[in-house]
């Protein structure tokens, strides 16, 4: 059984990681441990590189705390231009897989508050009245009328980031 450390306590991220690992390695093939670790970047990262650095830092910090695991996984959400997206970073002892998620264009009224220094989650919670929306459907769920959620978009990116771990060509 694979021991997988999720460098997050966010239920949407954990759900995406668990589902993707089960789809790739088989149902019941993984035990998931969830831990809170620092990203080393601002609460609301801006740009692809800062966001990717946050995910990489979370993986490194998770590895330091739980070095006996088989996989360490982090998902870091960020703002790039007028959109929100995330980076997924997965490592085992010998390699790394990374993938960027789909992007969601954000309305100007939301972007204005984020650019003033607020994190997207709290801005969206105020806008929607949904407490801790970032731990639930997120802006993605709201602006896609529930057709997608944070977890569903993260899930795709986790599947992509897992590609090097089950394909010999890598």
UniProtKB/Swiss-Prot annotation:
Pfam families: NTPase_I-T
Annotated positions binding substrate: 8-13, 68-69
UniProt keyword Manganese present: yes
Documented EC number(s): 3.6.1.73
Binding-site residues, Mg(2+): 38, 68
KW Nucleus (keyword) present: no
SUPFAM superfamilies from the UniProt entry: ITPase-like
Keywords annotated in UniProt: Hydrolase, Magnesium, Manganese, Metal-binding, Nucleotide metabolism, Nucleotide-binding
Class of enzymatic activity (EC top level): hydrolase
Family: Belongs to the YjjX NTPase family.
Function: Phosphatase that hydrolyzes non-canonical purine nucleotides such as XTP and ITP to their respective diphosphate derivatives. Probably excludes non-canonical purines from DNA/RNA precursor pool, thus preventing their incorporation into DNA/RNA and avoiding chromosomal lesions.
Name used for this protein in its record: Inosine/xanthosine triphosphatase
């Amino acid at each position: 059984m694979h021991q997988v450390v999720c460098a997050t306590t966010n239920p949407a991220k954990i759900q995406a990681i668990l589902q993707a690992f089960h789809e790739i390695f088989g149902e019941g093939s993984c035990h998931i441990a969830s831990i809170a670790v620092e990203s080393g970047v601002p609460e609301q990262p801006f740009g692809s590189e800062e966001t990717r650095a946050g995910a990489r830092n979370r993986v490194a910090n998770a590895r330091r705390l739980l070095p006996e695991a088989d996989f360490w996984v982090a998902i870091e959400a960020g703002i790039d231009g007028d959109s929100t997206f995330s980076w997924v970073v997965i490592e085992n002892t010998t390699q790394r897989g990374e993938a960027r998620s789909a992007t969601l264009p954000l309305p100007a009224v939301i972007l204005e508050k984020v650019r003033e220094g607020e994190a997207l989650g709290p801005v969206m919670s105020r806008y929607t009245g949904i407490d801790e929306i970032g731990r639930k459907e997120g802006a993605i769920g709201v602006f896609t009328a529930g057709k997608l959620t944070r977890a569903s978009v993260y899930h795709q990116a986790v599947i992509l980031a897992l590609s090097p771990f089950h394909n010999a060509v890598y």
